[in-house]
């Protein structure tokens, strides 16, 4: 009976890996993206990049000379705006917007992607009740983190696409 449970568990794990299943946030990096140098990123973006690369075999390097790719952050913009009001005039729903403008350079300093912008958005409901203020603040913090992570995934996808064009 113990053998059959173990066999079922092993078979389930094999089927998961065979279907391409991977953990959320895990990214398969091409060789040129395994070492990246990040220039001029905010602390929040730097943290999201570190988390993304920690889940892979990639590494963030401290010098552009060591990098297979260079991410040059040109501009970052974060905004929270009201998208609906209650009958008493308080904000009920907010939209969070994160916009990242960047260049991607290869290891020789050649531009792969120039002046690209990624914009990610999310919204959340806030009833403005004193009992939920703290939880809504925490919800916004989590959503901000997810927006940064989404932007990082988009940068990596664009980098991968450009590398496929360069090295088919």
Per-region residue spans from a language model:
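C-terminal/domain-edge helix-coil "capping" segments
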Residues: 130-168
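C-terminal motif of bacterial Sec signal peptides marking the signal peptidase cleavage site
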Residues: 15-18
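Surface-exposed short loop/turn segments
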Residues: 72-117, 121-141
